[in-house]
């Protein structure tokens, strides 16, 4: 996978910020890829096109997760279903699958079970800092993900995550 320039990563983040919670319908040609982030402070459902450019992003502030653990299972499912429905409305297509992430050192099933309960087929899962490393196609770097309740760190060498830890493990 070819590394992308940092300005391209920033452009993608700026687009995501600009379209966040924008329900205006858009036409997207080709496949889309959906990700679900169950955070301590919020829940996000984002869709990107086949080039990795955000085409839909919905965020809802929530307290369904605490320190990387889902503490309100029903609430998390309800929010994910609502945000997926909003994504479907914006894109004019049914969402049946998604990827998700989790804080390093926690059980991935805490996130994947929510997707399953929301009737989404799991495409992939990885710890949160590793997801950013993949998105940015980093070759050699350290990624720090400072969240609302956890801080994850990943070290990347030759494009592979060689270490990934959470502040709770340190």
Question: Residue locations for each model-derived region?
Answer:
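Conserved structured catalytic cores and adjacent interaction surfaces
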Residues: 154
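Nucleotide/phosphate-binding catalytic cleft detector across ATP-hydrolyzing
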Residues: 1-40, 44-146, 158-169
